[in-house]
Amino acid sequence: MLFNDGTPSLNQPEGAPAGQALGASVVSAYQIDPVARTAREVWRFDHQPELSSEFCSSVYQAGSSYLVNDAMADNAATARIVGLDANRQQVFELSYANPGGGCATSWNAVPVPFEQLQFD
């Protein structure tokens, strides 16, 4: 599973392809055949409407749920955290300002357990 930010590589060995530029970022999971040395995409999550987050983003699996971090969404003006359930359906989205527009506001999202959280 990976977060494909859609940005071609900026630092690859000389002569190596930089990769394809995509119009939007996607999360994809692959089935890998180590003998044939091939990979086949088995599912993907495309945020609707489409988002582009060119750097710093990630996806995290916790059990059968997923946490998607679009760290530089909306032309790097916001960070968006999206929760997906076991059916990979969006169950929540949190959007917050990304002052400065870089990777300092958000990087790798990690689930925080709120089961024992109490407010006084």
State the predicted function of each range.
Residues 1-120:
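Histidine-/acidic-rich catalytic cores in large beta-rich domains
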